Amino acid sequence: MPTARCSMRASSTAPVRMMATAGGARIGAILRVTSGNFLEQFDFFLFGFYATYIAHTFFPASSEFASLMMTFAVFGAGFLMRPIGAIVLGAYIDKVGRRKGLIVTLSIMATGTFLIVLIPSYQTIGLWAPLLVLIGRLLQGFSAGAELGGVSVYLAEIATPGRKGFYTSWQSGSQQVAIMVAAAMGFALNAVLEPSAISDWGWRIPFLFGVLIVPFIFILRRKLEETQEFTARRHHLAMRQVFATLLANWQVVIAGMMMVAMTTTAFYLITVYAPTFGKKVLMLSASDSLLVTLLVAISNFFWLPVGGALSDRFGRRSVLIAMTLLALATAWPALTMLANAPSFLMMLSVLLWLSFIYGMYNGAMIPALTEIMPAEVRVAGFSLAYSLATAVFGGFTPVISTALIEYTGDKASPGYWMSFAAICGLLATCYLYRRSAVALQTAR
């Protein structure tokens, strides 16, 4: 009898151990696959926050406005490479697998990070300085074009049934962790270094940290396992067939791009551009602007999985439409309140509200985008739609916001840009879910 009881006890605990092991394996996979996403966003946020110092170092001009515009133009140029990277690297990932492809994107991304740390100033090497910065941004844009799509699809393919929204939200969640780390480092530098030291060389320290963690991220990525869904698929399209399938489904790609427009505009407005907006437009201290950005990233980190989980429960369409309508109704009025009464608390309140809208919308949008693409070109299709939106909307949000304020005199005018992106997202959502019964086409 004791033996029988022990046997029954062992058999009853075996499923629990298996579930715990499977859960631990999925958590490990999430950490490994999102590590590269962390590096990408860490670097992009730093470039946005230290834009004034980068402008001074690499893009000297007759006026601060012109210098800053050139810096943000180079920042945006990297996004123009994203659609090319999405097609080329996205097709490669769809052909050879998620694991191999994501190691390649990380390698290219790391090269761009190394460049920004090592390039001497304009006064030292002249025109080579801005040219090399541009090359670094183009390389990072090329790799980022497929990095985000590859990570999102990987998470969608390892998700447990009915929890795809929750799982894919951690792609964007890793970006928020990157912003938290970058903002915390910037806050610490402001506390220990004089402004002149930060302007001369101190701004490079966070970028150096990014370089130092690259080997550890490579180790994590190499331990990734291929998804069962990709392995089980018997037919993998050749590169030419991937391009043909994307062309056959161009309407889905364009509608997907418009759906992403809302999320990428909101994200770059409240994170990448916000520190510069706080310092240069609202005249808040650099430390206050950084602290607001840090708290906004924490807010994003909370709302992203909530949005994903709610979309699992109530459907993607409901969450997407609700958030686009909220953005359309409140983006400009909220920024007008901030412009009329600029303070740390007001900036924090307004950006936390926009963070709620962004987090809820993006939590539903990422799984929706993985679901509307044909399985054979899921990474390439997702990446192309996302990259086009980032190139047209998100990447140029800082420069468009700067130009709108300069030429209209309205400090709240970035709200017009976000409202326009919300209209795009609303129309795309209605279109995609109205045509959900239409068969997607695969080129054979």
UniProtKB/Swiss-Prot annotation:
Segments in the Periplasmic topological domain: 63-72, 136-137, 199, 273-289, 340, 401-411
Keyword annotations: Cell inner membrane, Cell membrane, Citrate utilization, Membrane, Symport, Transmembrane, Transmembrane helix, Transport
Principal subcellular localisation of the protein: membrane
Subcellular location(s) per record: Cell inner membrane
Domain of life: Bacteria
Stored CDD domains: MFS_CitA
Gene3D superfamilies for this protein: MFS general substrate transporter like domains
Coiled-coil region(s): none
Entry GO CC: plasma membrane
This protein's record includes keyword Plastid: no
Stretches in topological domain Cytoplasmic: 1-41, 94-114, 159-177, 221-251, 311-318, 362-379, 433-444
GO molecular function, one term: symporter activity
A UniProt-annotated Pfam family: MFS_1
Its membrane topology: Multi-pass membrane protein
Transmembrane segments: 42-62, 73-93, 115-135, 138-158, 178-198, 200-220, 252-272, 290-310, 319-339, 341-361, 380-400, 412-432
Gene Ontology biological process terms, A to Z: citrate metabolic process
PANTHER family, A to Z: ALPHA-KETOGLUTARATE PERMEASE, CITRATE-PROTON SYMPORTER
Family statement: Belongs to the major facilitator superfamily. Metabolite:H+ Symporter (MHS) family (TC 2.A.1.6) family.
Additional notes on this entry: Allows the utilization of citrate as a sole source of carbon and energy.
Function: Uptake of citrate across the boundary membrane with the concomitant transport of protons into the cell (symport system).
Protein name stated in the entry: Citrate-proton symporter
Organism: Klebsiella pneumoniae
Gene symbol of the encoding locus: citH
